[in-house]
């Protein structure tokens, strides 16, 4: 996690912050299925952060109001975050947060998290930039985080909390970093064997797809991490395994690049996509 690692190197107290925004969960694109997955992720993240010395701080409220309150109480000097390509609602929220930081003298530092290039000047440069990002070294986690005992967390809303949408029908995919690593390993070693043959079949695709989309969307895996894991797995294949896994892993790697490319198009041409 680039922003967290960079923040930890400042040796200043850190607030690892997640904001539950009630207005977000009122939007038509929001789903309690998302929250079930995110809840798993946050519980996992809290445990991992606690091992470094500082628990996750959860706040419920409007993002700007939460940041403003934290700034008034704790004199926040910097905010470190990943770039994201969301929808119109999240875009407007991001702009509001940027204005708040600018007006209140808070330095906002954002880092890319995938192959999407913010303010790309030429499409001809995209593939080269994306490939260079995928080849960068996986960042280590911080050894420790200075504790911030004066900053108190709100209670993490329950999966069945009233601010979320309708109760989901059927099973919901389990989230969290540990589950993400297990799902990636399982796909590389087992499901990917017949990925190409069954990915378009409504019935069989359930058993041969990667199950990584939600992990990539909510950050329990990075695109770079998955791309490098594919390369590593291919290098370990025996001659017999290359016949069954090789082509399938290559195809999945291509689709992983498509994911970045499609999001890049949304980033670069949001108005055009809304019209069509």
Task: Name each model-derived stretch.
Residues 254, 259-276:
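Aromatic-anchored, charged helix-turn/loop surface patch used as a conserved interaction hotspot
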Residues 1-253, 263-264:
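Active-site "lid/cap" and pocket-lining segments within catalytic core domains
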């Amino acid at each position: 996690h680039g922003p967290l690692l960079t923040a930890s190197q400042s040796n200043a107290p850190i607030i690892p912050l997640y904001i539950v925004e009630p207005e977000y969960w009122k939007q038509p694109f929001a789903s309690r299925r998302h929250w079930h997955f995110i809840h798993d992720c946050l519980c996992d993240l809290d445990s991992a952060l606690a091992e470094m010395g500082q628990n996750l701080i959860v706040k419920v409220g409007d993002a700007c109001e939460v940041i403003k309150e934290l700034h008034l109480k704790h004199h926040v000097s910097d905010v470190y975050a990943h770039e994201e390509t969301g929808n119109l609602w999240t875009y407007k929220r991001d702009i509001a947060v940027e204005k708040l930081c600018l007006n209140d003298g808070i330095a906002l530092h954002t880092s890319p998290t995938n192959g999407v290039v913010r303010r790309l000047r030429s499409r001809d440069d995209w593939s080269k930039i994306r490939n260079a990002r995928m080849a960068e070294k996986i960042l280590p986690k911080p050894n420790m985080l200075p504790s911030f005992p004066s900053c108190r967390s709100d209670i993490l809303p329950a999966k069945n909390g009233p601010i979320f949408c309708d109760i989901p029908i059927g099973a919901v995919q389990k989230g969290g970093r540990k589950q993400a690593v297990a799902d990636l390993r399982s796909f590389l070693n087992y499901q990917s064997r017949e990925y190409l043959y069954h990915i378009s079949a409504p019935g069989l695709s359930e058993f041969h797809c990667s199950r990584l989309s939600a992990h990539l969307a909510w950050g329990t895996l990075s695109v770079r991490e998955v791309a490098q894991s594919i390369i590593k797995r291919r290098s370990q294949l025996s001659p017999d395994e290359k016949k069954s896994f090789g082509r399938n892993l290559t195809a999945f790697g291509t689709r992983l690049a498509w994911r970045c490319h499609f999001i890049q198009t949304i980033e670069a041409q949001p108005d055009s996509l809304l019209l069509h």
